[in-house]
Amino acid sequence: MRKIIHIDMDCYFAAVEMRDFPELRGKPIAVGGRSDRRGVISTCSYEARKFGVRSAMSSYHALQLCPQLILVPGRMEVYKSVSLQIREIFHRYTDLVEPLSLDEAYLDVTDCDAHQGSATLIAKTIRDEIFEVTGLTASAGIAPIKFLAKIASDLNKPNGQYVITPNQIADFVKDLPLSKIPGVGKVTSKKLADIGLTTCYDVQQYPKVQLIEAFGKFGHVLAERAQGIDSRQISPHRVRKSVGVETTLAKDIFTLEQCHQVLPQLIQELSTRVRRSAKDRQIHKQVVKLKFNDFKQTTIEHRSDEISINLFHELLLQALQRSQGRGIRLVGVSVGLADVTLASSESSVDQITQLDLQF
């Protein structure tokens, strides 16, 4: 088994703002767009979270929950710069670093000799160095596998860490709610609960064949996670699986004609991003996303090996038919990407060892 650390910065964007503007410290703040421009919260301070403010919430709703909330515009270039400082610290201990976003990453420290190979002490040292260099706190999860390390990093926040050793895995996952497993969202949780599955122990007792019948490939993944199995390796150079662009509209729109007016600029920007960041990848599907004024969303996708304007218009029509009279506040378009060899092969078909590791 490996020694995996998941580092997660504490309310990262908000923490950077409070560091740079001390007058914000101790106050409920959120980084996000203005409520009169239909902004959305990126992240918020712990003081704001006490009022129920959360990421991805509309700024308008956040201000209803917390009238004294201070909205701060994001400074993405600053966040990127600080993130690079943090990654430099990671690479002092291992080259096996898999960034998930600006504020979190997996590290494989199995072969790191620091602190006699203790992943627990390595994680603590990394967190201390992050604070020394950036003035920001980070939390960490330490485990032999990725998904448990990620779960563990959330168990002693803020500015803490949690360790799951190899011999603790079985007991830990037994009572673990399925909703804690990365990839199990509200919709999947409800589907699982409808068939009596709420914990990993429930899944352990459930026939794997039926799980796969109900959830497809994810059923197989879920069965493994419920047993404490995750064979994924750290990927220092993560392969991009999709490229997309979306826009939040100044006012709700309701008609197909209004939606069509939004598409050209989105498709142009998407094409630019694909050329810039996915030169060696092959398009294998197109996706349209609509978010309605009740914040529920829908996506429609179809196989395609190129960006087709006509197909985007067809997918938009199908997505709009799900609106049920609701206004549309966001429109997005994206493409799925695959290796050139994988994409070409798809198109030809119809459309617990080493338990003595120091933790």
From Swiss-Prot:
One of its GO terms (cellular component) is cytosol. The record marks F13 as: Substrate discrimination. Gene3D superfamilies: 3.30.70.270, 3.40.1170.60, 5' to 3' exonuclease, C-terminal subdomain (1.10.150.20), DNA polymerase, Y-family, little finger domain (3.30.1490.100). One of its GO terms (molecular function) is damaged DNA binding. Coiled coil: none annotated. It catalyses: DNA(n) + a 2'-deoxyribonucleoside 5'-triphosphate = DNA(n+1) + diphosphate. Signal peptide: none annotated. Mg(2+) binds at D8, D103. Binds 2 magnesium ions per subunit. The active site is at E104. GO terms for biological process: DNA-templated DNA replication; error-prone translesion synthesis; SOS response. InterPro entries: DNA/RNA_pol_sf (IPR043502), DNA_pol_Y-fam_lit_finger_sf (IPR036775), DNA_pol_Y-fam_little_finger (IPR017961), DNA_polymerase-Y (IPR050116), DNApol_IV (IPR022880), IMS_HHH_1 (IPR053848), Rev_trsase/Diguanyl_cyclase (IPR043128), UmuC (IPR001126). Its EC number is 2.7.7.7. Its cofactor is Mg(2+). Keywords: Cytoplasm, DNA damage, DNA repair, DNA replication, DNA-binding, DNA-directed DNA polymerase, Magnesium, Metal-binding, Mutator protein, Nucleotidyltransferase, Transferase. It is found in: Cytoplasm. The keyword Ribonucleoprotein does not apply. Residues 4-185 form the UmuC domain. SUPFAM superfamilies: DNA/RNA polymerases (SSF56672), Lesion bypass DNA polymerase (Y-family), little finger domain (SSF100879). Belongs to the DNA polymerase type-Y family. PANTHER family: DNA POLYMERASE KAPPA, DNA REPAIR POLYMERASE UMUC / TRANSFERASE FAMILY MEMBER. Monomer. Poorly processive, error-prone DNA polymerase involved in untargeted mutagenesis. Copies undamaged DNA at stalled replication forks, which arise in vivo from mismatched or misaligned primer ends. These misaligned primers can be extended by PolIV. Exhibits no 3'-5' exonuclease (proofreading) activity. May be involved in translesional synthesis, in conjunction with the beta clamp from PolIII. This is DNA polymerase IV. The gene is dinB.
